[in-house]
């Protein structure tokens, strides 16, 4: 009988069929950039002042500037306050008394806010996300990140239950519906609810697409294929900048950014199911048909004798989450990986959500952020091969953290310098995130690899949820968020020095292999041992069995 891996080796690790699938799976990653970061361009800073009805209703015949002067106090810099107004004077007050600021007691805005005329509709001016409601901007981003966590927890089992293909199709449809409905909301609370639903579905299709890709691509090309698919997220960041620059109406931007997902209806006819999943469900004939189709597309038709021998791969014993903490060596590795993944997310989204805070044009900065992500992710592969996994992870996290700390000391009149440092930090954080997937998969034993990946992914999502809340600390001091975004990655990076190197090492299969540091496969003679270890070094340098994508 032939194992699935043997048959797929004859089909080809990365032929024309897998290339097509990589392109198909890259599209959801491309669209995901809009869903994650589009709100940044819908809440841009704009002037706002208390709407003062008594001035508007009076027949003083004052100009707009005079109305502002008699109704709004100035701050310490001499600019009109955004969240305070003078108390309305008595009805019998004369114009002279009002102009002399005789009635100069202030209060919070009680009738809404006025915004510049002819301004495009935005989330900020439609739902008054200013003053005491300004924190809702960050809260809604945390709600979205919480949806990503829930989606990963919910759709992981769904993907295993109904299959990769139907799960992916369902999640794409739900994403489109939730995102399109967001453009027609009448309250910000409803907006946040739909964003949560969108994030849940978004996490689902990212998970399903990467699972499907990992189960079709051979081990020698799996890491590269998944990095290529994830690089489409960076292309989506660049496209988002151009789209947001041209479309300033937030509702229209939401509609245009969502529409492409409905064009993926052709996935219903071209998207294949995972043959590995079909075999696990006992649907052997369907799996054989798919494998033969892939072989024909790759120009490597299979012999019917080999195909008829296809049987599911045998699964070994599995572990649980508690096993990650029972063994001293694995406990140390797990705790450090939790810190690394938490910081990966905190840093990546911290820089992404602050794209407009570095002084340069927000649209230009967004394009630059997208541009640097592509080489950052692609360069992580040769970096890991040259420096090793441990030092690549340590250096990228530390570099990103140092950049964030330096930004704190850059004067506000040097936006180019601050942006340049942020770009270097963005490059390093993107590379660090990609390295984490490979390094984590190689550090954890086979029997508990998926469980461990799931656990650290949860903490990564928690980091994403906390990121917008950390940014709220800027109301106490502007440097606090960037100090946190800088110091934590440096600490996590230095912790990586305590981890073992996995470059050129045989992947561990059991908990005993990890603790004893012994090769996981048995051998009878010295030549067989060399062959096995050489094979392990060859494969482990390229293989990271990653079943989900955070980006």
From Swiss-Prot:
It comes from the Eukaryota. GO terms for biological process: negative regulation of fatty acid metabolic process; nicotinate transport; positive regulation of T cell mediated cytotoxicity directed against tumor cell target; urate transport. Glycosylated. GO terms for cellular component: apical plasma membrane; endoplasmic reticulum; Golgi apparatus; plasma membrane. GO terms for molecular function: nicotinate transmembrane transporter activity; urate transmembrane transporter activity. The chain crosses the membrane at residues 23-43, 143-163, 168-188, 196-216, 227-247, 252-272, 333-353, 355-375, 394-412, 417-439, 453-473, 479-499. Residues 515-537 are annotated as: Disordered. PANTHER family: SOLUTE CARRIER FAMILY 22 MEMBER. Belongs to the major facilitator (TC 2.A.1) superfamily. Organic cation transporter (TC 2.A.1.19) family. This is Solute carrier family 22 member 13. It comes from Rattus norvegicus. The lineage of its organism: Eukaryota, Metazoa, Chordata, Craniata, Vertebrata. The gene is Slc22a13.
């Amino acid at each position: 009988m032939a194992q699935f891996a043997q048959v797929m080796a004859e089909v080809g690790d990365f032929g024309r069929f897998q290339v097509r699938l990589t392109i198909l799976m890259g599209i959801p990653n491309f669209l995901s950039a809009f869903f994650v970061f589009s709100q940044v361009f819908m809440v841009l800073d704009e002037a706002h002042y208390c709407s003062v009805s008594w001035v508007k209703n009076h027949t003083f015949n004052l100009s707009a500037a005079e109305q502002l002067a008699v109704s709004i106090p100035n701050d310490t810099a001499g600019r009109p306050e955004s969240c305070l107004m003078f108390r309305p004077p008595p009805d019998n007050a004369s114009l002279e008394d009002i102009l002399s600021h005789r009635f100069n007691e202030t209060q919070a805005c009680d009738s809404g806010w006025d915004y510049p005329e002819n301004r495009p509709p935005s989330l900020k001016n439609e739902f008054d996300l200013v003053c005491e409601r300004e924190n809702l901007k960050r809260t809604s981003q945390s709600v979205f990140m919480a949806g990503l966590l829930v989606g990963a927890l919910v759709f992981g089992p769904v993907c295993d239950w109904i299959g990769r293909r139907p799960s992916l199709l369902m999640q794409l449809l739900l994403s489109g519906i939730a995102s399109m409905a967001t453009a027609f909301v009448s309250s910000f609370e409803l907006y946040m609810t739909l964003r949560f639903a969108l994030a849940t579905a978004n996490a689902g299709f990212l998970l399903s697409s990467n699972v499907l890709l990992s189960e079709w691509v051979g081990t020698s090309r799996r890491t590269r294929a998944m990095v290529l698919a994830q690089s489409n997220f960076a292309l989506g960041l660049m496209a988002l900048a151009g789209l947001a620059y041209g479309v300033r109406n937030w509702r229209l931007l939401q509609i245009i950014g969502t529409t492409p997902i409905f064009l993926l209806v052709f996935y219903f006819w071209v998207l294949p199911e995972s043959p590995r999943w079909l075999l696990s469900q006992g649907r052997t004939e369907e799996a054989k048909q798919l494998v033969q189709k892939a072989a024909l597309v790759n120009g490597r038709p299979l012999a019917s004798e080999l195909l008829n021998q296809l049987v599911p791969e045998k699964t070994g014993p599995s572990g649980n989450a508690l096993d990650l903490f029972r063994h001293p060596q694995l406990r140390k590795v797990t705790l450090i990986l939790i810190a690394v993944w938490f910081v990966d997310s905190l840093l990546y989204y911290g820089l992404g959500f602050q794209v407009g805070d570095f002084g340069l044009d927000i649209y230009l900065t967004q394009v630059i952020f997208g541009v640097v992500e592509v080489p950052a992710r692609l360069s992580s592969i040769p970096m890991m091969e040259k420096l090793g996994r441990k030092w690549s992870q340590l250096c990228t996290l530390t570099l990103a953290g140092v950049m964030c700390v330096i930004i704190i000391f850059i004067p506000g009149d040097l936006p180019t310098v601050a942006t340049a440092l942020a770009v270097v930090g963005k490059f390093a954080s993107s590379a660090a995130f990609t390295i984490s997937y490979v390094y984590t998969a190689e550090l954890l034993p086979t029997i508990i690899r998926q469980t461990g990946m799931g656990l650290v992914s949860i903490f990564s999502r928690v980091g994403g949820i906390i990121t917008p809340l950390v940014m709220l600390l800027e109301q106490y001091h502007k440097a606090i968020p960037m100090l946190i975004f800088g110091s934590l990655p440096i600490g996590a990076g230095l912790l990586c020095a305590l981890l073992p190197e996995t470059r050129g090492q045989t992947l561990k299969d059991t908990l005993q292999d990890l603790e004893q540091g012994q090769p996981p496969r048995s051998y009878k003679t010295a030549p067989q041992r060399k062959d096995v270890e050489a094979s392990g070094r060859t494969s482990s340098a390229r293989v990271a069995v990653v079943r989900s994508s955070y980006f």
